[in-house]
Regions:
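Conserved small-residue
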Residues: 1-542
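Duplex nucleic acid-engaging cores and interfaces of nucleic-acid transaction enzymes
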Residues: 553
Length: 560
């Protein structure tokens, strides 16, 4: 499933080697490889800048920003040479410029190793050499494990990198090794640093307790199959703040400017040492004055904190190893000492779309008549027929894959698609019609597999920030959203009062939730900064039904 979060602009790219263990095994774990040969063998890959890459630059005494500044200078010089604005425009000069750019982009101390066999892995962890550099295993990311890819680093840098990655945590505190490595792996996420907030508070998660009906799966000692028990009005505890925190609107605005994004932004996915999750803009200062009548909150360590001294509120589910530090001040001091900063990986997209494709999992649980099926596939059939029938608007819409806007031509990737945007008569050209016909054939094949267009979109999900504020100020937790409801500024503005929620991978029909959308002055006021976010109530089991999702994303099919 796609994220309804957008990769932020201008994350710089670096290059690293990516080798298979079989390649090293054949070289007796001591490989000499020229960069030209590595490129020809697709053994040089591009990675987005990350905290780990910044750590490696820092350990080498290199300024990461200085690298990009020099690369930009060299690219400008190359452009001037190509345009005839430089006296020395020889091919040798251009070649030397590109060679320097490639050298600056490469991080030779960072190597991705693809494990071809268990025996190879057991040998690789003892270390190997490539071009005179000895590499040792550093960590595996959650995404890397799925593709048998492990991060190795230059042996001489590993102790310093591990010290930074551990970030002064209490090493005596027990930690599950797999989880600890997963948390350390956050340092390899593509991210862009942002300025330090003017104060941070870490608060306890907001738990909401109620009774509900649910299915309980139990493992049986004498059977390989689980036992399903129907529980009626059983006790339920929901973490309504799982994976998200709050940021002052001013902080989100400042970070948006630093990221060179177009505002307003309804939320950001952030990283720091052992810290991950979404933060959403919410005026907790206003809540303190109008609702709590207090400026004091108790943080997760039990310390009193003044809410007006903070721009960022983290929850314990975001700061994974909070209990390995004495206080928030201790945590932030270690971050500063080890070179950690807050950084942003993705943002909530400022623009949503009114239609998206389903997948077969979302359709399978429904029992539909022939008429139901005809109604469901009608928009998709209309798209295909319209394009083949020469409708310029539908052709343009299909080629872009998203809703049409006036400035669409500037963003179209294919020449013939741009041509249609400029002159619709291009559709009469045999070549263009042939190309579109090939694409439509593929589109029809996808539709047969359940990729049906309906009115709906992917939405970033949040718990109720009003309830979180009630919790952190020690008030009775009620929230603003009753059971079975949610709030969506985007869909409310379009007159939608009910949605169906799905989340992939979807295993059964119980994961489809019908949700009524609340729209009242109180919700509109308190949630006014959270554009394009689906805010869920904490008084039902929607998050559990959506395969135990935390505050990330869900597909919503709009119903009116």
């Amino acid at each position: 499933m796609q994220w309804r979060r957008k990769q932020i602009k201008n994350i710089r790219q670096r290059k690293v080697m990516k080798l298979h263990t079989a390649r090293l095994r054949k070289a007796n774990w001591n490989l000499t490889l020229s960069m030209s040969d590595a490129k020809r063998g697709n053994e040089i890959v591009t990675l987005a800048e990350s905290t780990l890459i910044r750590f490696i630059d820092n350990a080498k005494g290199v300024d990461t920003g200085g690298i990009y500044h020099r690369i930009d200078e060299l690219k400008s010089q190359a452009a001037r040479i190509k345009n005839g604005y430089e006296e020395d425009s020889s091919p040798a000069t251009l070649k030397s410029i590109y060679a320097e750019i490639n050298k600056l982009l490469l991080v030779p101390e960072y190597l991705l190793l693809v494990i071809d066999s268990e025996a190879d892995y057991q040998r690789a962890v003892f270390g190997f050499t490539v071009n005179g550099i000895t590499y040792k295993r550093l960590l595996a990311t959650a995404a890397g494990v799925k593709t048998s890819t492990i991060i190795f680093v230059a042996d001489y840098l590993k102790p310093e990198l591990l010290q930074k990655l551990n970030n002064g945590r209490d090493m005596i505190k027990p930690a599950v090794p797999s989880k600890l490595e997963s948390y350390m792996g956050l340092s390899a996420s593509a991210s862009k640093p942002v300025s330090m907030p003017r104060g941070v508070i870490v608060v306890k998660d907001c738990y909401m307790r109620f009774k509900d009906d649910y299915l309980l799966l139990k493992d049986l000692d004498d059977s390989d199959e689980p036992y399903i028990e129907e529980v009626h009005q059983g006790d339920v505890e929901v973490d309504n703040s799982d994976g998200y925190g709050l940021a002052s609107p001013a902080l989100i605005e400042r970070w948006t400017a630093e990221l060179e994004e177009d505002g307003p932004v309804g939320g950001m996915c952030i990283r720091n040492a052992f810290c991950k999750g979404m933060v959403f803009p919410f005026d907790f200062y206003e809540f303190a004055g109008l609702v709590a009548n207090s400026d004091t909150v108790i943080d997760v360590w039990g310390h009193e904190q003044n809410i007006y001294d903070a721009e960022l509120i983290l929850t314990e589910s975001m700061l994974k190893l909070w209990d390995s530090y004495k206080s928030c001040e201790d945590y932030l001091a270690n971050c500063k000492e080890n070179g950690y900063t807050f950084s942003v990986t993705k943002i909530v997209e400022p623009q949503q779309h009114e239609s998206r494709e389903l997948n077969y999992q979302f359709i399978q649980p429904f029992e539909m008549t022939d008429d139901d099926i005809r109604e469901l596939i009608a928009p998709t059939i209309s798209d295909i027929s319209g394009v083949m029938g020469g409708d310029p608007a539908k052709a343009l819409l299909y080629l872009r894959g998203v809703d049409q806007t006036e400035d669409s031509a500037a963003r179209l990737s294919d020449d013939y698609a741009q041509a249609i945007a400029i002159d619709p008569d291009v559709l009469n050209d045999n070549y263009v019609r042939g190309q579109i016909s090939k694409l439509i054939s593929k589109r029809a094949d996808r539709a047969k597999l359940g990729r049906i267009r309906v009115r709906g979109d992917f939405n970033v999900v949040s718990g109720d920030p009003y309830a979180l504020c009630q919790s952190m100020f020690g008030l009775e937790v009620t929230g603003l959203l009753p059971r079975g409801t949610a709030y969506s500024q985007y869909w409310n503005e379009r007159g939608v009062n009910e949605v169906l929620a799905f989340r992939a991978p979807m295993t059964n029909g119980h994961s489809i939730r019908k949700i009524k959308l609340v729209d009242n002055p109180s919700c509109r006021w308190w949630y006014r900064y959270m554009r394009n976010v689906m805010i869920l109530t904490g008084w039902d089991m929607t998050m559990a039904a959506e395969n135990g999702c935390d505050c990330d994303k869900v597909y919503c099919h709009a119903r009116q």
